[in-house]
Amino acid sequence: MRSLYLSFSLTIIFVLVIMHAEAKAISEPNAIAEADPRFLNILKTIGKILLPIIPTVAEKIKEKVG
């Protein structure tokens, strides 16, 4: 159960970071191009880790709720 909460929390954090990056890209079109490459690599790594987890988390939530 604890791992479910951890996965869900990490997924939400990742989504919020991506939304923030998209909002910044809209308001400042050159912001992503000027972003620190290390930050972008960290985002890519987090994405690679979390994307396979998201469907599993969604299924577990469906099982708990319904």
UniProtKB/Swiss-Prot annotation:
One of its GO terms (cellular component) is extracellular region. Expressed by the venom gland. Residues 1-25 form the signal peptide. Keywords: Amidation, Neurotoxin, Secreted, Signal, Toxin. Disulfide bonds: none annotated. Belongs to the formicidae venom clade 3 family. This is Myrmicitoxin(1)-Pr5a. It comes from Pogonomyrmex rugosus (Desert harvester ant).
